[in-house]
Amino acid sequence: MNTIYPVIWSNNKVLLIDQTSLPSRYTLVEISRYEDMAKAIKTMIVRGAPAIGVAAAYGMYLGARDIQTQDRETFLKHLDKIAQILRQTRPTAVNLFWAISRMLKTAYETLGTVEEIKKILLETAQKIQEEDLQTCQAIGHNSLSILPTNPEKLTILTHCNAGALATAGYGTALGVIRSVWTAGRLNRVFADETRPRLQGAKLTAWECVQEKIPVTVISDNMAAHCMQKGLIDMVVVGADRIAANGDTANKIGTYGLAVIAKMHQVPFYVAAPLSTVDFSLETGDLIPIEERDPSELYQIGNTVIYPDGVDYYNPAFDVTPADLITGIITEQKTVNPKELITLKG
């Protein structure tokens, strides 16, 4: 198995796989300032809720490292400002806010000198990264107990990229697929291309190719046809934020996929760590939905493909109601969305 780590701590700086360059070029971007990390998150050089959380944690440390004061209160005030800048990068991904809050909590609760706080912050960022990798592996393992018994080898449809590139490594939805592949139960992956940024075609397909997992890319509007023809045995997607009732925000197009799966009685699972669950939100109606630049819709490379005078609407996410979700696969266990609240720590 080829190991893919989108966020790497090396020689006192962060290396990010530039996901905007894949699959044509594999490029590492060096990040040594928190401002550059904020830009990398905003421009989706690093993307996927868990990976964003890991990147933000390192961003907090990079910012803390550069604060030039030995006064604890002054240091913490500067750190609060850094946190606010990082929070503004991607509003839907709850792991971003979770990781930043954890880093701030660590700083405020650490007694000692400013230099000691900085040291603990680096250790905390590394711990967040290590924990996420272990969590993804646990999600993959837990999925094996809920697989349909027939057929023996399953064809799984996924949307966007919830793989190693979207996490600390291994992946959530693609982590499930990796585990099913390793267990000998996978026939093939169907990857929605995932308009407008094509994360399925570019990133999920790339990850599968790296590990020689059979993958077929389809356009988003082919999913219904594939289910109608009996080509899909189950659907597994990731999540950017899950409300307490199980409503799930994920890449735009996920909701439609869930409706189609319900129509054709295809099991529809969400794979996500508990850090993606926002228990403070009762329902998905309260999840903020990021809207991105319309150029993602009308431009391919430097070429504008639609006529002048057209208006655009480009939400990055939609919310799938809990009653369309068969189960949520977490690092603890798989639960019915209505039972998600029982896993609250």
UniProtKB/Swiss-Prot annotation:
It is an enzyme of class 5 (isomerase). Disulfide bonds: none annotated. InterPro entries: IF-2B-related (IPR000649), IF-M1Pi (IPR005251), IF_2B-like_C (IPR042529), Initiation_fac_2B_a/b/d (IPR011559), M1Pi_N (IPR027363), NagB/RpiA_transferase-like (IPR037171). Coiled coil: none annotated. GO terms for molecular function: S-methyl-5-thioribose-1-phosphate isomerase activity. The active site is at residue 240. Keywords: Amino-acid biosynthesis, Isomerase, Methionine biosynthesis. Pathway: Amino-acid biosynthesis; L-methionine biosynthesis via salvage pathway; L-methionine from S-methyl-5-thio-alpha-D-ribose 1-phosphate: step 1/6. Catalyzes the interconversion of methylthioribose-1-phosphate (MTR-1-P) into methylthioribulose-1-phosphate (MTRu-1-P). This is Methylthioribose-1-phosphate isomerase. It comes from Crocosphaera subtropica (strain ATCC 51142 / BH68). The lineage of its organism: Bacteria, Bacillati, Cyanobacteriota, Cyanophyceae, Oscillatoriophycideae.
